[in-house]
């Protein structure tokens, strides 16, 4: 996928990249054929973020690329400070391009006396002056409703779909690594025209280890686990082992966001997984032979172009 070149009227457009994922910003810029605008991003001696926009943005439509990944709080605050600087510099509109939306897992009250942090972050973004959000594979789709501004939640499945087809697997089947991810896995299975199986983990009694039940058959099949993010990798590694024990020929995991915290890389290396496929929505710090990274920068570039030209985004995914 390649964004078509900008027309002369794109003179009213500027694109900035924060420090969270500069390589992604450069790649999007390259696909757009439009240079990144400049800003000086620094910190005071006490850690406070300090930003100065290095060129005029008066009357311009601004797109800021900044996934709110690790360090989540610093990257989120940097985004907010940059938006404030742009708004006070008379930008016409400000769109936040968040390949990964941090705090998305705190989308409801799952226990007494806990916050709904995803809603609080949405409030902060709107209050500071963000007028549109472009993100991908939100952990909970209902987060779109936390905003009173347009939210374009892109589907990472578009790049996974092409990759899976290129593998020419003989007897593939889609799997959800847990019951909570069934809707996401079913969507991908429908896109691919494949069957769906589910890994259901249960603890039959207190203080007993989890039992992995497979709903459907994985025997002699190439299983493709589908999830929105891979954090500690515990769930997909346990699911892969259960699937191999049932007779799966191979097990591949697809995860849009490679959070990979803690011992995730070590778990993946030692697991029954044959391959883990992720996108570059988050910079991959550690390398692993089992991990394949697909770029979604061309997708984001084309979406930015379409939004600026008031063209349909949904048609990309149909």
From Swiss-Prot:
Mg(2+) 1 binds at residue 139. Disulfide bonds: none annotated. Keywords: ATP-binding, Cytoplasm, Kinase, Magnesium, Metal-binding, Nucleotide biosynthesis, Nucleotide-binding, Transferase. D-ribose 5-phosphate binds at residues 203, 227, 231-235. Its cofactor is Mg(2+). Mg(2+) 2 binds at residue 178. Pathway: Metabolic intermediate biosynthesis; 5-phospho-alpha-D-ribose 1-diphosphate biosynthesis; 5-phospho-alpha-D-ribose 1-diphosphate from D-ribose 5-phosphate (route I): step 1/1. Its EC number is 2.7.6.1. GO terms for biological process: 5-phosphoribose 1-diphosphate biosynthetic process; purine nucleotide biosynthetic process; ribonucleoside monophosphate biosynthetic process. It is found in: Cytoplasm. Homohexamer. Involved in the biosynthesis of the central metabolite phospho-alpha-D-ribosyl-1-pyrophosphate (PRPP) via the transfer of pyrophosphoryl group from ATP to 1-hydroxyl of ribose-5-phosphate (Rib-5-P). This is Ribose-phosphate pyrophosphokinase. It comes from Helicobacter pylori (strain ATCC 700392 / 26695) (Campylobacter pylori). The lineage of its organism: Bacteria, Pseudomonadati, Campylobacterota, Epsilonproteobacteria, Campylobacterales.
């Amino acid at each position: 996928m390649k964004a078509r070149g900008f027309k002369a009227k794109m003179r009213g457009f500027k694109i900035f990249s924060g420090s969270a994922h500069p390589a992604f910003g450069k790649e999007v810029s390259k696909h757009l054929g439009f240079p990144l605008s400049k800003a000086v991003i620094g910190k005071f001696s006490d850690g406070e973020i300090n930003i100065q926009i290095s060129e005029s943005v008066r009357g311009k439509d601004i797109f800021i690329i900044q996934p709110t990944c690790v360090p989540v709080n610093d990257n989120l605050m940097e985004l907010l400070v940059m938006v404030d600087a742009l708004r006070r510099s008379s930008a016409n509109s400000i769109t936040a391009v968040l390949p990964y939306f941090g705090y998305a897992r705190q989308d409801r009250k799952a226990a007494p006396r806990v916050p709904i942090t995803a809603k609080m972050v949405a409030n902060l973004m709107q209050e500071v002056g963000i007028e549109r959000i472009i993100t991908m594979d939100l952990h909970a789709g209902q987060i779109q409703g936390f905003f009173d501004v347009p939210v374009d939640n892109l589907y990472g499945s578009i790049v996974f779909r092409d990759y899976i087809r290129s593998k020419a697997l003989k007897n593939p089947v889609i799997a959800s690594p847990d019951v909570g991810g069934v809707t996401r896995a079913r969507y991908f299975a429908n896109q691919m025209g494949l069957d769906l199986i589910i890994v259901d983990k249960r603890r039959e009694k207190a203080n007993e280890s989890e039992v992995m039940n497979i709903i459907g058959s994985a025997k002699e099949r190439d299983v493709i686990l589908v999830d929105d993010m891979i954090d500690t990798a515990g769930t997909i590694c346990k699911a892969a082992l259960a699937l191999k024990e049932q007779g799966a020929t191979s097990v591949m995991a697809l995860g849009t966001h490679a959070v990979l915290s803690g011992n995730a890389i070590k778990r993946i290396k030692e697991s029954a997984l044959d391959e883990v496929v992720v996108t570059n929505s988050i910079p991959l710090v550690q390398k692993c032979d089992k991990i394949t990274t697909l770029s979604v920068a061309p997708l984001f570039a084309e979406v930015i172009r379409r939004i600026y030209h008031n063209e349909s985004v949904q048609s990309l995914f149909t």
